[in-house]
């Protein structure tokens, strides 16, 4: 007998199937339904990609009909201990195996070689892993700890995978298109919802060891279909009870975790009966049900709730009453327990009644209704919505089907009616806590269906994208939270910033319009935001492209998986109508693929246009700021030109001709005719009071106005022009209006400015030369006066007899000489103003002339004395003092006149 070991990680469904057959002692090659894969790899088992997540083992699944479709098996590892079994038992199983008109195990996950799995032991012997005795494997404690750690890690990863965003819950039995297993929980992967297998487990009270009995030759196919799923007792198999106990423990763990709702035994029996009828119906023959089918159906039981007792006689009687009610045309309603796991099709319960003819279309009605009436676009709506409360979109789709076509496809369809008291009975069976959880889950499903049906696609905005799929009702709250917390990925120039700056609308239409100061502040903030965005632009582009590519890849994977699931269930579409529906589903998948690509591109275009809208608003603010600057510059430039004209007029007036018509410079006007003309030395640059010309928000150093030269006096007597680059320098003449002698342009000086500058420089040089020569002349005059005083003192000592006359004569000569000298100097200054530049030469010439005059005076006085000595003796001769002094010549000429 084989040993069944339950492992928390998944294994191939085919391996599970081989293990289940090996329990009965049947070789893998002898199992019917697996002969079509004998040429594939025999060395290694095939482990499917879409296996069940760890931590959720289920019962081993046996697939008895191609209409149910493939479904991944629970994660079990079977090590065959004793492969030898009696030949009689093997032959019995093979004989009792009901033949199936269609190919079995068609899913790609079940493509496993039927040859014996072999391996090599350390000694070199080849071991058949299925039929031979396997050696004992000793695992150390350290390896066990590692295995446990790996299992825990796998469980955590599975939980994260199941709860990640965008994954739908596992669909239920009645909601899936191909009647998936009724024991699916809400926490499983969507891969399970795509498969179409049916899981039928038994309670410990029923043995399913032996295969079904061969049908009688005269038995109708309906009875044969029921006997396919009926297990005859087979005593002497202790491992079956062990496996069922493990299944009970697993189901108890699921119920405790809230992933599996307990089920009523009576409802499960009716459900299993209808599923068996649906699976084993032969569409090629018209059958009539017999009482034998009812008897065989009474022995079938599905999974039972682990917290409910074994069905007793009273419950069996209640189940028979329910079956009778279903046969009379009242379908079983969807209960609260089935709401969490699945629903039973109401039309599949009336197939096995005794004495009623059932047509092929009526038998396949439950299979056909789901894929035909539910397009793939509303998969999330139709699979999870209850029949009592369908969404508006589902009602629309169902209403589109013509009534005549429905009557043609489904003859004898009866309107569903609820049997009284049935739902109350089901609620009483369930615990109170499970009732609350089931009700809460139904409310969540209803809310999700309303969101999917009642709204369009979510608004494409960065705020909704960053909040990771917030529902449309929570979008305003999400924007408020986003504005409070700040954006991590979003650029600084967002709708929130534009709304804060009051520029989310156009400036022309904004009430009230922004002032120049507000426009300047907005411009400063926008320029700062642009600069900050430039630092993170590359990283944000890479992140957005990566997220877009990931979303597109996920969408393509989902569509490919959905297409693979539809393709794998091609063997159940055996009617022409079914084939048309199958082709339509494939076309819908292709359309969805194209629509997903188009949606991605259109969303990208919408985002680009919205960003362009933001940038246009920011650019409008910047253009408004530039226009304000231009207007201010033109105003200031006009004022500057006006001041320039005034300065030129004042300069020409101050340098114009005088009243007498003679052009005079500043030096000549200061010395002519003793007039006190206003004279000012151009040496210091005066800062004008033009602060109003400075632009708002700019420093005086950044003023765009051209500056004027500032004339300063140098220490070496020459002049230098210093140009102030920041502020214009204008001249003041003591009056209210300012005088500007010249202006130097910023790029290139004008020729008129150069001429005015040269004239001012010449006038200044003349004035400096005049002042210097005048001071030297005063010094020379003082020296001459000192010299005269010394001579007078000497004369006094030499001629003491005539001191008074000598003093008077000297005073007269001094007065006459000083007056004549002053007149001469003034005359020379008036007539020859340029001679003032050569005062040193003039004074040297004057000194030479003075020396010559003294020499000539002495010579003339000597000659006069010698002539008088040669004259008559009666006349007096010259004294020694007269002969020595040159000024006595005048007296000698006056004495003969007096005599």
Swiss-Prot record:
Residues 534-632 form a coiled coil. GO terms for biological process: cGMP-mediated signaling; negative regulation of smooth muscle contraction; relaxation of vascular associated smooth muscle. It holds the Pfam family MRVI1. It is found in: Membrane; Cytoplasm, Perinuclear region; Sarcoplasmic reticulum. Disruption phenotype: Mice lacking coiled-coil region N-terminal part exhibit disruption of IRAG1-ITPR1 interaction. They have dilated gastrointestinal tract and disturbed gastrointestinal motility. Smooth muscle are no more relaxed by cGMP after phenilephrine-induced contraction and half of the homozygous mice dies before the age of 6 months. Nitric oxide (NO) and cGMP-mediated inhibition of collagen-induced platelet aggregation is strongly suppressed in platelets of these transgenic mice. growth. Keywords: Coiled coil, Cytoplasm, Membrane, Phosphoprotein, Sarcoplasmic reticulum, Transmembrane, Transmembrane helix. This is Inositol 1,4,5-triphosphate receptor associated 1.
């Amino acid at each position: 007998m084989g040993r069944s070991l339950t492992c928390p990680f998944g294994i191939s469904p085919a391996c599970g199937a081989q293990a289940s057959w090996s329990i009965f002692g049947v070789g893998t090659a002898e199992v019917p339904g697996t002969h079509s894969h004998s040429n594939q790899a025999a060395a290694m088992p095939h482990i499917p990609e879409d296996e069940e997540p760890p931590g959720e083992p289920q019962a081993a699944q046996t697939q008895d009909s191609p209409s149910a479709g493939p479904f991944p098996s629970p994660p079990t590892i079977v090590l065959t201990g004793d492969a030898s079994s009696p030949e009689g038992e093997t032959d019995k199983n093979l004989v009792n195996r009901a033949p199936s008109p269609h190919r079995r195990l068609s899913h790609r996950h079940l493509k496993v070689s039927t040859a014996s799995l072999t391996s090599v032991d350390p000694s070199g012997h080849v071991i058949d892993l299925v039929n031979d005795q396997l050696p004992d494997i000793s695992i150390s404690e350290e390896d066990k700890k590692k295995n446990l750690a790996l299992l825990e890690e796998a469980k955590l990863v599975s939980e994260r995978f199941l709860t990640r965003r965008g994954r739908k819950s596992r669909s239920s039995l009645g909601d899936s298109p191909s009647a998936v297993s009724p024991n699916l929980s809400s926490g499983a992967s969507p891969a399970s919802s795509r498969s179409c297998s049916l899981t039928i487990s038994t309670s410990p009270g029923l043995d399913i060891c032996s295969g079904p009995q061969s049908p009688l030759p005269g038995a109708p196919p309906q009875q044969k279909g029921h006997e396919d799923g009926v297990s005859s007792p087979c005593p002497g198999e202790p491992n079956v009870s062990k496996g069922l106990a493990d299944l009970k423990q697993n189901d108890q763990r699921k119920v405790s975790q809230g992933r599996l709702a307990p089920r009523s035994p009576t409802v499960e029996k009716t459900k299993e009966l209808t599923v068996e009828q649906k699976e084993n119906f032969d569409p090629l023959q018209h059958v009539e049900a017999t009482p034998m089918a009812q008897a065989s159906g009474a022995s079938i039981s599905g999974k039972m709730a682990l917290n409910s007792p074994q069905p007793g006689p009273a419950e069996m009687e209640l189940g028979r009453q329910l079956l009778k009610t279903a046969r009379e045309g009242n379908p079983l309603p969807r209960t609260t327990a089935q709401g969490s796991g699945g629903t039973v099709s109401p039309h599949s319960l009336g197939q096995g009644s005794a004495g009623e003819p059932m047509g092929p279309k009526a038998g396949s009605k439950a299979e056909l209704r789901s894929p035909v009436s539910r397009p793939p676009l509303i998969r999330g709506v139709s699979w999870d919505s209850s029949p009592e409360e369908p969404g508006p979109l589902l009602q629309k789709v169902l209403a589109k089907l013509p009534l005549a076509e429905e009557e043609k496809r489904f003859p004898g369809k009866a309107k569903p009616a609820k049997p009284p008291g049935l739902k109350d009975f089901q609620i009483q069976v369930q615990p109170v806590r499970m009732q609350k959880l089931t009700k809460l889950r139904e409310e969540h499903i209803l809310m999700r269906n309303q969101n999917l049906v009642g709204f369009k696609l979510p608004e494409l905005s960065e705020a909704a994208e960053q909040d990771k799929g917030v529902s449309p009702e929570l979008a305003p709250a999400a924007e408020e939270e986003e504005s409070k917390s700040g954006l991590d990925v979003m650029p600084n120039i967002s709708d929130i910033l534009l709304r804060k700056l009051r520029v989310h609308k156009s400036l022309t239409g904004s009430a009230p319009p922004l002032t120049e100061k507000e426009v300047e502040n907005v411009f400063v903030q926008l320029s700062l935001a642009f600069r900050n965005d430039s630092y993170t632009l590359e990283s944000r582009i890479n992140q957005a492209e990566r997220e877009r590519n990931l979303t597109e890849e996920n969408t393509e994977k989902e569509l490919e998986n959905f297409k693979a699931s539809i393709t794998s269930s091609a063997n159940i579409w055996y009617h022409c109508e079914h084939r048309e529906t199958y082709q339509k589903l494939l076309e819908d998948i292709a359309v969805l693929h194209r629509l997903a690509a188009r949606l991605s591109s259109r969303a990208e275009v919408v985002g680009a246009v919205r960003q362009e809208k933001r940038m246009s608003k920011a650019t409008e603010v910047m253009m408004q700021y530039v226009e304000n600057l231009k207007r201010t510059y033109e105003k200031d430039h006009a004022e500057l030109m006006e001041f320039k004209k005034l300065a030129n007029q004042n300069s020409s007036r101050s340098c114009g001709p005088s009243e007498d018509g003679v052009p005079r410079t500043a030096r000549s006007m200061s010395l002519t005719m003793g007039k006190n003309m206003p004279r000012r030395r151009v040496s210091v640059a005066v800062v004008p009071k033009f602060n109003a010309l400075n632009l708002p928000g700019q420093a005086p150093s950044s003023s765009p106005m051209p500056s004027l030269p500032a004339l300063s006096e140098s220490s070496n007597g020459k002049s230098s022009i210093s140009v102030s680059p920041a502020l214009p320098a204008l001249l003041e003449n003591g009056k209210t209006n300012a005088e500007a002698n010249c202006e130097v342009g910023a790029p290139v000086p004008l020729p008129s400015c150069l001429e005015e500058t040269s004239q001012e420089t010449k006038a200044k040089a003349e004035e400096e030369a005049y002042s210097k020569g005048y001071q030297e002349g005063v010094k020379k005059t003082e020296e001459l006066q000192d010299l005269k005083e010394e001579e007078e003192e000497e004369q006094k000592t030499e001629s003491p007899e005539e001191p008074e006359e000598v003093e008077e004569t000297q005073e007269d000569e001094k007065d006459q000489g000083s007056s004549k000298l002053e007149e001469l100097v003034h005359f020379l200054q008036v007539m020859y103003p340029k001679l003032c530049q050569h005062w040193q030469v003039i004074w040297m010439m004057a000194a030479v002339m003075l020396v010559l005059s003294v020499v000539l005076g002495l010579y003339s006085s000597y000659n006069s004395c010698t002539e008088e000595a040669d004259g008559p003796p009666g006349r007096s001769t010259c004294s020694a003092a007269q002969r020595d002094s040159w000024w006595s010549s005048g007296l000698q000429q006056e004495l003969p006149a007096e005599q």
